[in-house]
Amino acid sequence: MSKVTERVEAICQPVVESLGFELVDVEYVKEGPDYYLRIAIDKPGGIDISDCALASEKISEVMDKEDPITEAYFLDVSSPGAERPLKKEKDYENAIGKHVYVKLYEPVEGDKEWIGELKEVSKDTITLSAKIKTRTKVIEIDRKRIAKIRLAVIL
């Protein structure tokens, strides 16, 4: 996490929580000539457009006051979606028994990408049950090797 996203998260966390929402993710990116601050929020039962509008208004107020970003940017407040990223320990624990997509920095058992059911989570590793063609394989992955992990929708 960059210093900008850390600072934004510290500023926005209390605002989002005061509205009864959970701050799921903060992303600050440059796309072409424009900068985007993307904030994902959630709550039990899910987020709707009015929740996003309210959070956007309150976040915008505090961001204008604190001014942690020097460049002009677009603020985008949204739901994390069905394929939400797993960022916090709580996210990992809540995902046990669900399908996840894992992208790795380096291959594990010959692959850098895995989709499977998250079986176990520890401080240092995760365990997946992945289907490979017609058989199921249990894979243990060191968490330091994980570049990205999110829920996966399996149809």
Curated annotation (Swiss-Prot):
UniProt superkingdom: Bacteria
GO cellular component, one term: cytosol
InterPro entries: Ribosome_maturation_RimP, RimP_C, RimP_C_sf, RimP_N, RimP_N_sf
GO biological process: ribosomal small subunit assembly; translation
Compartments (UniProt record): Cytoplasm
Gene3D superfamilies: Ribosome maturation factor RimP, C-terminal domain, RimP-like superfamily, N-terminal
Major site of localization recorded for this protein: cytoplasm
Record carries keyword Transport: no
Pfam families per the UniProt record, alphabetical: DUF150_C (PF17384), RimP_N (PF02576)
Keywords: Cytoplasm, Ribosome biogenesis
Entry function: Required for maturation of 30S ribosomal subunits.
Family statement: Belongs to the RimP family.
NCBIfam families, alphabetized: PRK00092.1-2
Protein's recorded name: Ribosome maturation factor RimP
